[in-house]
Regions:
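Extended alpha-helical targeting/anchoring segments
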Residues: 2-479
Length: 479
């Protein structure tokens, strides 16, 4: 049902969803096969998975179909679309983005089924590096490459959210209805259980190219070190962009990537004329109830394939002065960012090794309690972009990145994920990720520079991070 409420003498529509639920056995299906069954019938569908099954939270995969409301920001306009197709357009230069997102989120409510402990509804989407002008007092000067241009931000509410509980081999279909809409749960169940699904091939259609040569990247590292020497910044994270043309179905690249580089955040978001997908090791920010959490990642070494050797490398990593100094700065930055709207900020774990397919990272955990009456999206603005993708002090690092990188970041180092109507927030940083647009795959990687960084080692770090993506491109051709 759909009710009109008066709030502060201004008319605001409050949309309350009537949610229908159906539970199915999921022991013969996978999120990938279900997504393949649904994506041609429901364009603009999303898939979120996790291969980090250490906790019950990460045992759930989600598929979202049929957007029914959304908020979208580009260079000039903010567009709000409500159920029933009512659209409101505002001048992007005259808005307070944090408040707009909060107001839009507050336009919806649903009755969550607490005992299921699943995401049944909310806003799913992303925001790009371009949003930084709405979070920080900074003006980006690098022009956006039209080939990489996508909306700065978009979140949607979906009619169908499918949750797959891998731990219990159960699947839930949540259908969100307004007014007197008829349920189509039967049809959705039929589509999910249909034995057939279409598959297509993927082919590379040319060589990889980059916005910078190896030597230019080494020179950029030297230039950043000069700024550190002068005291402009303590640490900075320049990056390098790559692109490769292709033909066919890029979903095969996602399938290859999730197999080669399992990670806590696997995602495939299809927006029709472009797609965002990746296998990110790093959370941008998590908010659950009153607690906000950042997981700074810094310290990267290539894996050997031998667990005993890898553990020795992890110990060495913790003792490496360059890696530890970088990590200390990022933990301090996370504490400072959270302190703006949180109390009781503390470091809960420090420099613990985490193992991924090609590399080992050192990870810490910093938490804070939201102050009373705080808009959770304020915390998002405070903590974006992650220090691990910018540097410290953050404002100066961002200014230098804008001046020297030569390529507007667009999706790279943006954030992607889920935001609850209640303000809960769980987003990954868009690293180890692809933007697919007009038959070209764009991808990017960087590394943290401190005073004693070695340009050759920094070049190698970028290659280590890109390795899994390049390997996925090769494997995708064989699927």
């Amino acid at each position: 049902m759909h009710s009109l409420q008066q709030e502060d003498k201004t008319q605001k529509m409050k949309y309350t969803f009537k949610t229908q639920t159906r539970k199915l056995l999921a022991d013969t299906t996978t999120p990938v096969s279900i997504y393949l069954r649904l994506r041609d019938i429901f364009p603009n569908s999303l898939l979120l998975e996790s291969s980090d099954y250490h906790s019950r939270d990460n045992n759930i995969s989600y598929i979202c179909c049929q957007p029914i409301a959304g908020i979208q920001l580009d260079e000039k306009e903010l567009t709000l679309t409500y159920p029933g197709k009512e659209r409101i357009v505002k001048n992007a230069h005259e808005i307070e983005l944090r408040q707009e997102v909060s107001d839009f989120r507050n336009s919806f409510e649903d009755h969550t089924i607490a005992e299921l402990n699943l995401i049944s509804n909310g806003l799913f989407g992303y925001f790009t590096f371009d949003c930084i002008e709405h979070f920080e007092d900074i003006k980006l000067t690098t022009t956006v490459d039209p080939a990489r241009k996508i909306p700065f931000m978009q979140y949607h509410v979906y009619k169908y959210v499918i949750a797959i509980d891998h731990f219990r081999n159960q699947l839930y279909i949540f259908e969100h209805l307004l007014d007197d809409e008829e349920s189509e749960l039967e049809r959705m169940q039929f589509l999910i259980q249909n034995k057939n699904f279409p598959e297509y091939t993927f082919k590379l259609a040319g060589e990889e190219s980059s916005n910078r040569t190896d030597e230019e990247h080494r020179q950029l590292v030297k230039k950043m070190k000069e700024h550190i020497q002068r005291g402009d910044v303590f640490q900075i994270v320049p990056s390098r962009g790559f692109k490769t043309p292709f033909s066919g179905d890029e979903f095969n690249v996602y399938r290859a990537l999730r197999s080669i580089n399992p990670s806590p955040y696997l995602f495939y978001f299809d927006y029709g004329d472009f797609k965002l997908f990746g296998s990110s090791p790093e959370a941008q920010l998590r908010i659950h109830g009153k607690q906000a959490t950042i997981f700074p990642i810094a310290g990267t070494f290539k894996r050997t394939g031998n667990m005993e050797e890898d553990q020795k490398i992890a110990t060495k990593l913790k003792e490496d002065p360059k890696e530890t100094s970088e990590h200390v700065m990022l933990v301090d930055l996370a504490r400072n960012d959270l302190s703006r709207h949180c109390t009781q900020v503390k470091v809960e774990s420090y420099m613990e090794p985490q193992y991924y397919s090609h590399i080992i990272h050192l990870v810490s955990k910093v938490t804070g309690t939201l102050k009373d009456n705080i808009n959770p999206f304020d915390i998002v603005g405070d903590t974006y972009p992650a220090g691990t993708l910018s540097g410290a002090p953050k404002h100066m690092a961002l200014t230098l990145i804008d001046r020297y990188e030569g390529l507007q970041r667009s999706f790279y180092s943006g954030a992607i994920g889920f935001m609850g109507f209640n303000g809960d927030f769980n987003h990954a940083i868009m690293i180890r990720s692809f933007l697919s647009k007009q038959n070209t795959l764009h991808y990017q990687a960087g590394g943290g520079i401190v005073l004693d960084s070695d340009p050759e080692m920094e070049l190698q770090e970028v290659n280590n991070k890109i390795a899994a993506l390049r390997k996925a491109l090769q494997l995708a051709e064989t699927l």
